[in-house]
Amino acid sequence: LNLLEIIDNPLQDIPLAAVMYSPIGHFSSEELAVIRAEEPPSQCKHLYDAATSFAQKYSDPTDAKNKESCHELAGRLRTFFNQLETYRRKSRYLLLRELLVYVLEDSGYYEFISAMPGAATRKANLDMLLERAGAFEKTSYQGVFQFVRYINSLKKYSVDYASAQELAQNQ
């Protein structure tokens, strides 16, 4: 859900940090700290602004002031934000379920969770999310923002259609 939240609005610091730190972003906590230390909140209010500023600042490998590690990190940031921008662009014309399938395939996240402990439950959770996205598309609401609100309201009111763990065990 964090990825959906930043597809909708990348200026949300907590979801952005979570995705950057996740297997989708592959950034370490130390790298996130370097980015934030280089671009403190007094200069860049949001992590997104700090990270894009860092990526631009260290983009030139021929600049002697640019440390090799910073240049490499800047390149990874540019790749990450290009991928995010692709998802944001696709969110404008793909159906929600199609977008989710695309993101899961493109990011390799579905394959990643398949190799983790509890893979069946994790896959069942993603399959349930895809089912809910399909059902959501049949309502009068549309878009990533509305879907995130819908899922958050389900969590808030503890609505659970079925345990993903039970579904995984039945497969």
Task: Locate the predicted segments by residue.
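Conserved helicase C-terminal RecA-like lobe
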Residues: N2-Q171
